[in-house]
């Protein structure tokens, strides 16, 4: 059985490119995930938000 973790995609807030995939626990983290990651298109660290 898979469990409570689901695969999500992280999208750059400035250029809207989907750069990263990760997993998150649906029960413990119900709100949208936002992380500061490096965007190769923008060539700098930018906030990335969760998309489906």
From Swiss-Prot:
Q: What is this protein called?
A: Large ribosomal subunit protein bL33
Presence of keyword Membrane: no
Gene Ontology, cellular component aspect? cytoplasm; ribonucleoprotein complex; ribosome
Does the keyword field hold Ribonucleoprotein? Answer: yes
Record keywords, A-Z: Ribonucleoprotein, Ribosomal protein
Name the domain of life: Bacteria
Q: Which family is this sequence assigned to?
A: Belongs to the bacterial ribosomal protein bL33 family.
């Amino acid at each position: 059985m898979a469990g409570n973790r689901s695969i999500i995609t992280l999208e750059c807030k400035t250029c809207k490119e989907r750069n990263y995939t990760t997993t998150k626990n649906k029960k413990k983290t119900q709100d949208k995930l936002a992380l500061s990651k490096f965007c190769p298109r923008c060539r700098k660290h930018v906030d990335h938000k969760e998309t489906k």
